Amino acid sequence: MANIAYTEYAVEGQTDNLLRLKQLMDDLAVPSTGSDEELSNSLDRLVTATGGNPSEIECRGFWKPFTLRMENGILLFEVESKWVEPSQWRAFIEKTFNVRMFYYTEQLGELILKTNDAKGCHFPYRYYFNGSSDSPYFETIDELCEDVGELTGEEDLSTFEDCSKAVSNYLHNHLDEPIILSQITVTI
């Protein structure tokens, strides 16, 4: 899939609803025909298996079966989909199973980084910067400023705008470095 969005989900709800969803996803993870195409359309197959119509719901993509797990009463898994997080699919699953799905999605080709986890309970990161540290994800502006400062040599960084300017100045002299700096959008 070109322009793939990678999305992580944390699903909350009553245990029996979560286990029912997980079991169905486990069952559908093994293609009945053994075809790669069937596996790559697992979002579509989940909609069909629960009585929905895939032609009415944007559901192009698949979940990664090896990421499907329960941890501390939360169902966790990852999805690859075309272009963006499959919000119609998510809304359908939330309604069908009476659950709440929190997500973090990124599509770096278009610099789309989003979460609907406003409180940061499951996805606390609010900034993305792949310039220097081991992880490109940062929860606070202070963490981001420190990391940007280490790379650029700039001091007294305290806002995202300061960081953006410092990275821009740095890239002016280091054109060959593929550095991305972005705020993660919080949607509701």
Segments from the language model and where they lie:
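Intrinsic low-complexity, intrinsically disordered or marginally ordered coil/linker segments
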Residues: 1-188
